[in-house]
Amino acid sequence: MKRKYIFLWCASFLAAGIFFASFFEFSLFGGGLFLFLSLMGVLSGRVFGKTGAVWVCGALFLCAAGAVRMEMAEEIWRQQSQYIVGSEGTFCGIVAEEPLVYKGEDGYARYLIDLRKIRYADGEEKSISGTVYLYDFAVENKYPVGTALEAEGKLRPLRLYKNPGKIDLEKRYESEHLLGRIYSKENNRIRPAGETGEYRVTRWAETMRERLACSFASYMDPVRLPVLMTLLFGGHYSEIPKDIIHSFSVTGIIHILSVSGSHIALLFGFLYFLGKWLGLSMKVTVVPAVLLVLVYAAMSGFVPPVIRASLMGILAVIGVLLERGRTALNLLGAAVAGMLLWNPYFLFDISFQLSVCASAGILLFYEPLRHALALLGKIPPRICEGCALSTAAQILVLPI
């Protein structure tokens, strides 16, 4: 077990603990006790110079930490107001994120609503917690993030399909504390109740994206504008015509429609050369560069690939600044460990899985594959690099 990959091992054991906790029930007290005992084992091993015991107890400690963190997250999910599923009344809540809009004859806008209370037909009110998807078929009524809404309807349960090969969204719904769906097909069933001042960062990001889109709108047609905004910030796939999405898919470049490490690398590279051109030192340049990357991540919605790429980029820049030996696999491990501690449900998110596996595949297999292709002697170097990169990214992704 190489020490330079310490964060990679940390992430692996944390993930193992989270995976274990998602299938087996245990109490937080029992998990905390095991966590304490394994920590004592690490400290005892250090005191008595037992390196093997330190590694074993350290691995157990990380597994226990992952399991406890997952149990804490599931306990929060169990405390949500799941008993209201199937209830009918007026649901009061706040728009938590930018709506997903589908245009056309049967178009609708889907809002994620952070519930606060329910008002029944007899006038009784109850405070509730959790989120719901609210479907508004009046697409022209767009409510910004942070707006309080009152929606009349019935809270219908989520449909979870267990078909082989279909993405299992159960853990993602639990992560969002999602209870169900409310459909509003009649007029005046959704009423705005003013601004709340909550979700300010998300509201700011939404406003900035809209302003940027408006500035581009005078130079681009309505078809290309959504493509540009998706290339810049990801998401909004529903606004791109299906034939264009199909063209990206059949040509094998649909992945550029999602934000990835290349976006972060380009941003850091641009700021580095800008600082160099202005005569600024690396230490002076790195602070605004990190801040700008965080702003960009916020504007992109803090989805798992953006968080991973941003964390890896920031850690790499800090490593350069401190003039430490840099190991890309270790940086990936640090980013993954941080994300899993923040939200253990990320482990079950298909976006997170594909992003991490593709990155790990490139870091592990790119150089060996490139070297193997170069030994053939008949393939130009650029083609060797392209083939090796593409193949390496697919190796760990294929099982998923």
Language model segments and positions:
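Membrane-interface helix/helix-cap signal primarily in integral membrane proteins
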Residues: A59-H255
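Catalytic cores of large soluble enzymes that bind and process phosphate-bearing ligands
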Residues: K4, L8, G30-G32, G52-V56, ...
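N-terminal leader/targeting segments
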Residues: M1-Q82
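Generic recognition of cysteine residues
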Residues: C10, C57, C63, C92, ...
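Hydrophobic alpha-helical transmembrane segments in multi-pass membrane proteins
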Residues: Y5, W9, I240-I400
